[in-house]
């Protein structure tokens, strides 16, 4: 075993995964996590891999790119996906987890590894020696200043938004119905149907509601995958009906008709006592937020256990700064992982940590770093963030559009996606023992 130690800064999804991958390869890890010594504006616990936006790790099917990336990670012994599978709650064709159980399990697996030493302290300087920086979208000001100095790049600021969570017992079950869109998978969502009149009343209240003021010096950039519902609404009345409130595939079993609009609620914990309001990330003040949400049929008396909040998110200009191995171009033993690289989403963040961790371990063992080909989901993400246009670089979720095109064109979308998945999983088999 090598005596060299790898520093991993941040025990979120990416940092926890990186630490585990390094440790399982016989390399000592010092995992630095500033919580609970210093908290962030969005975290509430001292657990590793705390989920702060939604409890869903999104699609679990192989006809979706994020489902493919999960399967690749399973094959490569991802601690994040293993914990998620063990803590899953009903969510139709998606993989959703009991967030508290999930964080506890990741913490247990990583903390108890004999090659991992956890250091509960804030890092304010970039360490010398092999290091993985996975401090996430809420990197502390001192370390942010050091990273800005290191990269010579300006950070880009934008806001991720968290959806409200309500108590199931406070939902009027006579007004909602259990159904997944197009009856895919098990019926996992509670649906709140709206007539056009009810939608109009809700819409007018939403666009008139008061939001929390943003700091003047921070430029507003919203990532489409986690955009506040009031920002979507400001783009026009139909944005919601064709977005998070789209009713297609959600016929009301009582009437046999498709409602004008539907608000979906998804189970948030294993016990099934909490539900989050899907797609309703918001920056509304809490008083107006409650008034608006109680205009949704079935939620007139809803007990809100967590109001929607927004927090800053930060990412570096990876095309200028990183290689597809997640190494910093100007320093071979410095790696970045997670959302600060411009991968967007829980699963994508963990996947970047997996690859950065593998390559950090390989580096200290004198082995060549691995570049996964872009026919794989993980390889396509690494390729995107390092090879795309640096001038217009924005965060990106996993999607088949990032994959190397298929040699043969396939017209039908499902068959095409299945072909992408088959090719990816066949290719990743060549890397499972690295």
UniProtKB/Swiss-Prot annotation:
* Entry annotated with the keyword Nucleotidyltransferase: no
Tell me the keywords, alphabetical order.
Cytoplasm, FAD, Flavoprotein, Methyltransferase, NAD, NADP, Transferase, tRNA processing
Q: Where in the cell is it found?
A: Cytoplasm
User: What EC designation does it have?
Assistant: 2.1.1.74
- Superkingdom is Bacteria
Which cofactors are named for this entry? FAD
Q: Which GO terms describe its biological process?
A: tRNA methylation; tRNA wobble uridine modification
What is its EC class? Answer: transferase
For whether the record's keyword set contains NADP, the answer is yes
The positions annotated for binding FAD are: 10-15
- Name the catalysed reactions: uridine(54) in tRNA + (6R)-5,10-methylene-5,6,7,8-tetrahydrofolate + NADH + H(+) = 5-methyluridine(54) in tRNA + (6S)-5,6,7,8-tetrahydrofolate + NAD(+); uridine(54) in tRNA + (6R)-5,10-methylene-5,6,7,8-tetrahydrofolate + NADPH + H(+) = 5-methyluridine(54) in tRNA + (6S)-5,6,7,8-tetrahydrofolate + NADP(+)
Supply the InterPro entries for this chain.
Answer: FAD/NAD-bd_sf, MnmG-rel, MnmG-rel_CS, MnmG_N, TrmFO
Q: Which GO terms describe its cellular component?
A: cytosol
User: What NCBIfam families has UniProt attached to this entry?
Assistant: gid_trmFO (TIGR00137), PRK05335.1 (NF003739)
Q: Which family does it belong to?
A: Belongs to the MnmG family. TrmFO subfamily.
What does it do?
Catalyzes the folate-dependent formation of 5-methyl-uridine at position 54 (M-5-U54) in all tRNAs.
Protein name as catalogued: Methylenetetrahydrofolate--tRNA-(uracil-5-)-methyltransferase TrmFO
**Organism expressing this protein natively:** Bacillus mycoides (strain KBAB4) (Bacillus weihenstephanensis)
Gene coding for it: trmFO
């Amino acid at each position: 075993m090598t005596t060299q130690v790898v520093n991993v800064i941040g025990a979120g999804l990416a940092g926890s995964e990186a630490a585990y991958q390094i440790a399982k390869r016989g390399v000592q890890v010092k995992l630095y996590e500033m919580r609970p010594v210093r908290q962030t504006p969005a975290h509430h616990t001292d657990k590793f891999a705390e989920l702060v936006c939604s409890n869903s790790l999104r699609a679990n099917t192989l006809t979706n790119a994020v489902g493919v990336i999960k399967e690749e990670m399973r094959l490569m012994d991802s601690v994040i996906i293993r914990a998620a599978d063990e803590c899953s709650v009903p969510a139709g064709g998606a993989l959703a987890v009991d967030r508290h159980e999930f964080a506890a399990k990741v913490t247990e697996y990583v903390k108890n590894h004999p090659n991992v030493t956890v250091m509960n302290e804030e890092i304010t300087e970039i360490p010398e020696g092999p290091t993985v920086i996975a401090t996430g979208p809420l990197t502390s000001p001192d370390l942010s200043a050091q990273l800005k100095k290191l990269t010579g790049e300006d950070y880009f600021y934008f806001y991720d938004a968290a959806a409200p969570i309500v108590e199931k017992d406070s939902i009027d079950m006579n007004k909602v119905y259990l159904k997944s869109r197009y009856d895919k998978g098990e019926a996992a969502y509670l649906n709140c149907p709206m007539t056009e009149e009810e939608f109009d009343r809700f819409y007018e209240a939403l666009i008139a509601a008061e939001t929390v003021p943003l700091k003047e010096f921070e430029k507003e950039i919203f990532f489409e995958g986690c955009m506040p519902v009031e920002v979507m609404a400001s783009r026009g009345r139909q944005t919601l009906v064709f977005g998070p409130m789209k009713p297609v595939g959600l016929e009301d079993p009582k009437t046999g008709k498709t409602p004008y609009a539907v608000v979906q609620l998804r189970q948030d914990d294993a016990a099934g006592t909490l539900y989050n309001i899907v797609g309703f990330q918001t920056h509304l003040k809490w008083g107006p937020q409650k008034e608006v949400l109680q205009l949704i049929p079935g939620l007139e008396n809803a007990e809100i256990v967590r109001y929607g909040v927004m927090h800053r998110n930060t990412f570096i200009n990876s095309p200028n700064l990183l290689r597809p191995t997640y190494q910093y171009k100007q320093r071979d033993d410095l790696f970045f992982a997670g959302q600060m690289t411009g991968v967007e989403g829980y699963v994508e963040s963990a996947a970047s940590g997996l690859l950065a961790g593998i390559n950090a371990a390989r580096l200290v063992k004198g082995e060549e770093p691995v570049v996964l080909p872009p026919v794989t989901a993980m390889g396509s993400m690494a390729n995107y963030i390092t090879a795309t246009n640096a001038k217009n670089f924005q965060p990106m979720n996993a999607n088949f559009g990032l994959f190397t095109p298929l040699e043969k064109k396939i017209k039908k979308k499902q068959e095409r996606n299945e072909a992408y998945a088959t090719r990816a999983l066949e290719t990743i088999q060549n890397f499972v023992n690295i």
